[in-house]
Amino acid sequence: MLRLTRNWTRTARFTAIWLFALTTVLPLTFAQTIDKTNAHSTASDPVDFSQPLTIRWRYESNSTLNLTPAFDDERIYLPLASGTLVSLMGASGQLNWRSEMGGELSASPVADQRGVYVASETGKPDSGARRATGALRLLGREGGVTQWMRTLAMPLRGALTLGNGKIFGGGSDGKIYAFDSANGEARWAYDYGAPFNSQPVVSGKHVYLGSEDGNLLALDEETGKLLWHYRTKGAIRGAVANGNDIVYFGSGDGYVYAVNATNGRLLWRKRTGAGVEAVVRTNEELLVASLDNFVYKFSLAGARLWKRRLPGRISSQPLVTQLGALFMPFSSSAGVVLELRDGRQINLLPTGEEIATSAAPIAVGAVVLLTTEHGLLAFAAPREKPPLK
């Protein structure tokens, strides 16, 4: 897995990230309403994309990664190179703590009231070691102290997910794991065989996860038993969307799929111009981001409602509100907000540099946070000036 450190030249780093974007999607992925444990795609109402948003604060670092930060109602947990994680207050950017675990972080973290769950790895592919060593740990919310840690034969990839008292992750060893979130004890492991680089999504009694060999798997979230799988012709790296007993997802083969959540039978599929990076359900429609630089809107029955071209390829999940969706096009210098109704551009969030990361945008309260090559930017509505006396 590509990791980015401060000693890269700008040209070499951008080239590497561009190749990364064509082969790997790291989901945010985070459901930002009531459930923060699944795909990072839906922001709560305090974010109003119809009004101007300006930079409220910034955290500077040349060690950001292609991993989406974790968050809770108040705090952000930013992954950095060399196994480092920092905790920041969402409203002000104030540093709470910094934890240095060593090695490298291997998957996007996830947070709850206990703290933040972090996957890491030690050993490098070129070090001569036959196998890398993975680890999963819980860092406490207040001080970043390790509460528990479990070692794994191989590291977890993509993103972690919380659900029903368990933490889920897919590994580079082809296994899907479930751990008790309170103490880290293994609940089950399913050995699929092909590696994973995506984010599990928990819905009811099922957990869904896409594989590098093009299969979407549905497992019993309590036992890990495989319920069904659906095969496509491309890697599945984005998180699935679901509702009304239907699962929607995209594949590297360029198609958007809708399958029955109970048995995995195909209901419909629709072609885009390139590999599909993200599928998000919004009310009664689907937003689809493709590597052809277009954003598509489909009805839940598969009818295309509109498509809009963006100034670069999209390699991360969008951040969606009731009004609009924020996308981070590669090589552009601003996040782009499209109105959900007709796809027209309604806002821009200038970053001051080319976007060169697959980390997804997130929101904490009314603050929108964008990971850049040089740190974290926090956007919010301008503060109201006090009335003149």
What are these regions (language model features)?
Residues 32-63, 94-101, 135-140, 145-152, ...:
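Aromatic (tryptophan-biased) beta-strands that constitute blades/sheets of beta-rich domains
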Residues 89, 140, 180, 220, ...:
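Structural recognition of the beta-propeller blade-terminating site
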Residues 1-10:
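N-terminal secretory signal peptides that target proteins for export/translocation
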